[in-house]
Amino acid sequence: MTMKLGNYKDNDVELCRTTNSRVSTHTAEALLEQHIPFTKNSKKIPFFKREAYKGADTLWVITINPRRYGQARRVIDSMDRVYKDRLVLSNY
């Protein structure tokens, strides 16, 4: 069953990803302060692929509506360098 909410389509794009839970929480708080809607999901990293992620077991992915992407990138660009350096930004 598909629910239709007006012209809503599930076409969110990835804003950023990180393996650090604290960085993902700080990024989510920064987006909330600016009233930017987003979705934060976690993905479990398989045991044998953890070496590529420096031993992390969870990958946090923040997705956003494409129309709000520019505004969200400005929020991330204004974050502290300590947090920003731990994010992998997409090139949407």
Range-by-range predicted roles:
Residues M1-Y92:
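Acidic/polar low-complexity segments and flexible, solvent-exposed patches
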